[in-house]
Amino acid sequence: MNGAAVVAEILKREGTEFLACYPRNPLIEACAALNIRPILCRQERVGVGMADGYSRIKRGRKNGVFAAQAGPGIENAFPGIAQAYAENVPMLIIPAGLPLARRYVRPVFRASDVYRPVTKWSALAHTVDELPDLMRRAFHAMRSGKGGPVLVEIPNEIFEAEYKGALDYTAVKVARAAPDPDAIKEAARLLLAAKNPLLLAGQGVLYAQASEKLVALAELVPAPVATTNPGKSAIPENHPLALGASTRSRPKMFTDFMKQADVVLAIGSSLTITPFGPGVPRGKTLIHSSNDPDDINKEHRADHAVVGDAALVLDALIAEVEKQKGKGGDKALAALKDEVAAAKKAWLAEWAKHIDSDEAPLNQYRVIRDLMRTVDRDGVIVTHDSGSPREQMIPFWETTAPGSYMGWGKSTQLGYGLGITMGAKLAAPDKLAMNIMGDAAIGMTGMDIETAARNRIPILTVVFNNGVMAAERDVLPISIEKYGALAVGGNYAKVAEGLNVASLRVEKPADIVPGIKKAVSVTQSGAPFLLEFVVKEGYDFSRYPLAGL
């Protein structure tokens, strides 16, 4: 077999179900020969997004793979890979490479060198014989510790070279690290000594598939639970201890309970400071738990650290809290649930005029409300897009099942939600996969709805169309006044129709729910659907600032 066949066989043994790709790359044909389905995207960043979304929903137990052409193909993939790196998504990128003899001839693009700052691990194949070792290292990097994209650049001459002998390769297992027992004892002591403890869960809880354990610890302490943007749905948000997730916008109770907390356990989060992450205000006792020791004290001063896999940390904490606390505490738990419920009710009352609005153009919060009431939230995977949809969805979309929301925002590329939604649908075909994007975002990647139609990936794409990039109005006043700089017009339902995607444009409140039902019905038949809502130019976001960040 040649090098391409070797890599394809390894992918087969690792459980690869499809290859997101854009030609030319010899791996595409080699994978097709082994019944690994090639899915050709319109744009490389969307193909990367498909691998990303698949990896998220598979929680790193299986990994999405993207193959690109040498030179312009892998150059054009940069936005997607940078986004995945910011979000710690464990996926595999395999670009073809130009001849090794020309590697340092300008302007040859050396992918394995250029991508090193935005990958967890990056390597170049020099010989066909080293391919099994490189692939083993790549899968180990994806399945141990903190996730991240890995890249193996394979020059075409290595793909074409003959591999002699039998292939000796066994699939790589997930590696997890258990916490230090002494660190667990001190963390439990701090939580139980706190007057107002709070748990802040990141996406590490989702990757560890530890949501039930998170809820168990919260009820045992007891403590309310907030989540980061990527950690949204780590606790079902209809749980009486859930405070919701945070980007720049957040539920008011998130801010209120974080302000009064004296001890915060951040688990499964890097606590990286971004404009779209909550952070932990200064002046609190911070217990920081991550599977990557480099996260500790990176951005926040940790008063106590627990390094380990989130599921193993939670198991150990539950056992230790039970040991230190003993029986009882039901009254405290009931009182805390009542306090959270009252705070949530008051916050939603503040926003009722938006949520229940009958205005036209439509209010985005009314559309979100009707989406939540109409779809099966236990059977959905939903994501926002960059910009206003993120700020509107993160606070107000109430999740009911772990892993039912894909939050992202350390890098915030317009249009990224489309690709990851296709990947999510491929990972969980029984779920309704839905992305909410604005008119600016669809301008970036919208042509790839044709990819969904061509490949029978039945996603639901919701477009909020107000004809303007509303979130940028405050930074471009002169440009807007003199040149109308923010206007972005279009009828996206008609665009979808031209790309063989069923679609509907909704302008009246009474048509929202019937439109949603029609869209869901079409996806259930096996085809994608684009549902466009003509919405108002909105600047109302649920922003309750946290001081001391």
Regions found by a protein language model. Give the residues of each.
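Conserved donor sugar-nucleotide recognition element shared by glycan-biosynthetic enzymes
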Residues: 47, 74, 107, 364, ...
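Glycine-rich phosphate-binding loop signature in dinucleotide/nucleotide-binding domains
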Residues: 59-60, 145, 376-377, 428-430, ...
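Phosphate/pyrophosphate-binding active-site segments
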Residues: 2, 129, 165-167, 189, ...
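A glycine-rich phosphate-binding loop feature that marks nucleotide/adenosyl-phosphate handling sites
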Residues: 153-158, 387-389, 534-536
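Conserved short loop/turn motifs at secondary-structure junctions
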Residues: 202-206, 356-357, 438-440
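Thiamine diphosphate
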Residues: 102-104, 297-299, 305-307, 311-315, ...
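N-terminal alpha/beta PP-like core and its mobile active-site loop of ThDP/TPP-dependent enzymes
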Residues: 1-331, 432, 451, 458-461, ...
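Active-site diphosphate/adenylate-binding microenvironment
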Residues: 4-7, 12-14, 18-34, 342-424
